[in-house]
Regions:
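N-terminal glycine-rich phosphate/pyrophosphate-binding loop and immediately adjacent elements
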Residues: 2-138, 143, 148, 152, ...
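Secondary-structure capping and boundary motifs in well-ordered enzyme cores
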Residues: 12, 26, 291-292, 315, ...
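Residue-level detector of alpha-helix initiation sites
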Residues: 20, 24-25, 29, 191, ...
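Alpha-helix N-cap/helix-initiation motif
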Residues: 23, 233, 269, 312, ...
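Glycine-rich loop(s) and the adjacent beta-strand/alpha-helix scaffold that form part
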Residues: 36, 40-64, 247, 256, ...
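Conserved redox-cofactor binding core of oxidoreductases
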Residues: 69, 73-87, 93, 97-103, ...
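FAD cofactor-binding and catalytic pocket of flavoenzymes
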Residues: 88-113, 117, 121-123, 128-131, ...
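A glycine-rich dinucleotide-binding beta-alpha-beta segment and adjacent secondary-structure elements
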Residues: 209-229, 259-267, 403-414, 419, ...
């Protein structure tokens, strides 16, 4: 079939070398590496294929902007989301007094969330691999003294991932280890960003051009939150899944959701899926989960059996726990009075407050332009419908007060806690979509650090007209969700070993951000890709010895 897609019946007949659940930065990269080594790989993807040539795919704009009429009904909106590579899963947030239902802006389709990401791909600091020492008051956080791998062990995999994803940018002046990354240069700063860069340097700070997995073709809009139309976004769909199926014999099952793993005491025997034609039972030597830090733990917890009464690979009772998502506050500034910036501008990184006065906070970086007002007015439900009725007024207010500035994201590391978690849902939503249940609260240590961090940012941008858009308290901000199946040395306090294999199962691996034992304060994409290459090499050497 086109683009490597395989018939469901044929997929059931084959005994695969590796079944990879999810095609994002972790699954796509690992599957590509194994396929390139000659392994028979099957990708399972819950969402639609958005590979080139698939009809109906929405590119170059968010679906709320591209198909406004379709998005005003529930059915039309969900269909448009799926065709735009967006998740239709419902999230039930039980953190407050009353449960809240919403849909996160997460990827679903070939490439997963990498197809929507802002393309920032930079290495973690060496200190991120020994995190606990940088927090004065971790309280009851489970943040470890160290990851089970070191920066030095990750170094060659970082370099390989940077090459695979075509990363361009400048080294961070505050990070000696960044200077060793031989990255091609990114384009020069835009005029608006250069004004801010000059101001920051004048304050004695150290801005740099963010490393971006982008080819910067003429007309590049650095597509964030939607699919790229001109093939300059280097995501796992373009750089890994497509070559895996087109050149290296991998196969792809889309619109196919893994619902349960069947296992004995030591091995996963079947991956049970719901597909367009019904229930499938797929078999393989190795099973790799990369469905994201919400879906992966939910899948394990929903795989309870007599052999695994608490959920698969959950002897520690840590599956689903230690949920982290980064605490991100947005600040919009206007560096030049009377000037408006509407062009793509995701360029600046600043880490002067990453490690500051003996404490760890996070990064400040360009966020890109404000989302279109249609995100508010074009959707199902009473509020979008009401806003649509007064659309000219809403648009005027939005354009006047919320648009035209440079948006900076103050992204602070949050710590892992056992009570922040993903839980099994009681069942699907009313519309038969997958429902995920989560619980997350900001702990006192994070509240204290966030207060200090945001104070520094406000002081930094004091000379400019500014608008504090906040955001850190909003549990819908899940783009960097991680930590729910952490790796570590001790099976009592981790789910996976140092090679990302489940402590209790011989053939089960997890390579999405679930494995993070701490969230660091930077974008996770490059670390996920680098680690996936590392784990793929381990699987190839140990599970398929020559």
């Amino acid at each position: 079939m086109a683009n490597g897609e395989i018939d469901e019946a044929e997929a059931e007949r084959v005994f695969w070398d590796a079944i990879v659940v999810g095609t994002g930065m972790g699954g796509g990269t690992l599957g590509y590496s194994l396929a390139r080594s000659g392994r028979r790989v099957l990708f399972i993807e819950q969402g639609r294929s958005t590979l080139p040539g698939v009809p109906g795919t929405i590119r170059a704009a968010m679906p709320e902007l591209a198909e406004p009429l379709a998005c005003r009904s529930v059915e039309g909106y969900q269909d448009a989301l799926a065709r735009a590579g967006r998740s239709t899963d419902e999230i039930e947030d039980i953190s407050g007094r009353k449960p809240r239902l919403y849909q996160g802006l997460l990827g679903s389709g070939t490439g997963g969330s990498s197809s929507l990401y802002g393309m920032v791909c930079e290495r973690f600091f060496a200190g991120d691999f020994t995190p606990r020492q940088y927090f004065h008051n971790p309280g009851d956080s489970t943040v470890p003294e160290a990851w089970p791998v070191t920066y030095d062990e990750m170094r060659p995999w970082y370099e390989a991932a940077e090459k695979l994803y075509g990363v361009r940018g400048q080294p961070d002046p505050l990070r000696p280890e960044a200077a060793e990354a031989p990255l091609p240069a990114a384009p020069p700063f835009s005029t608006a960003n250069q004004v801010l860069v000059d101001y920051l340097r004048g304050r004695g700070l150290h801005p740099y051009h963010l490393p971006m997995a982008c080819d910067y073709i003429d007309g590049c809009a650095t597509c964030q939150s939607y699919l790229c139309a001109q093939q300059c976004k280097n995501d796992s769909a373009r750089n890994c899944v497509l070559p895996a199926v087109a050149q290296h014999g991998a196969h792809l099952l889309t619109e196919c959701r893994a619902v349960r793993l069947v296992a004995d005491a030591r091995n996963v025997k079947e991956v049970v899926c719901e597909s367009r034609v019904g229930t499938l039972a797929l078999k393989g030597k190795v099973v790799v989960l990369a469905a994201g830090a919400l879906v992966t733990p939910a899948l394990l917890l929903n795989s309870r059996s007599a052999e695994w009464p608490s959920g698969l690979a959950n002897g520690s009772d840590w599956v689903g726990r230690n949920l982290m998502r980064h605490l991100i506050d947005l600040f919009e500034i206007w560096p030049e009075r009377g000037e408006r910036t509407l062009a793509p501008n995701k360029e600046i990184g600043l880490n002067d407050f990453y490690f500051w006065e003996g404490q760890k906070y996070g990064t400040i970086q360009s966020f890109g332009p404000m989302p279109p007002v249609e995100l508010l007015t074009n959707g199902p439900g009473p509020l979008p419908k009401a806003l649509h009725l007064v659309n000219p007024v809403v648009r005027e207010v939005y354009q006047r007060f919320f648009n035209g500035g440079l948006v900076l994201a103050a992204m602070m590391e949050d710590l892992p806690y056992l009570d922040n978690r993903v839980l099994p849902s009681d069942g699907p939503s009313n519309h038969r979509r997958q429902r995920l249940r989560m619980q997350y609260r900001i702990h006192p240590g994070e509240i204290e650090r966030r207060t200090v961090f945001t104070r520094q940012v406000k002081d930094l941008v004091k000379p400019f007209r500014k608008l504090n858009l906040r955001g850190a308290k909003d549990n819908r901000a899940l783009a960097h969700v991680c930590g729910t199946c952490r790796f570590g040395e001790d099976p009592k306090s981790s789910v996976l070993d140092a090679q990302n294999r489940a402590h209790e199962l011989a053939n089960l691996y997890v390579v999405d951000t679930s494995y993070f034992p701490s969230s660091a304060g930077l974008n996770p994409s490059l670390t996920v890709a680098a680690n996936a290459l590392r784990v793929a090499a381990h699987i190839d050497a140990t599970d398929f010895p020559s």
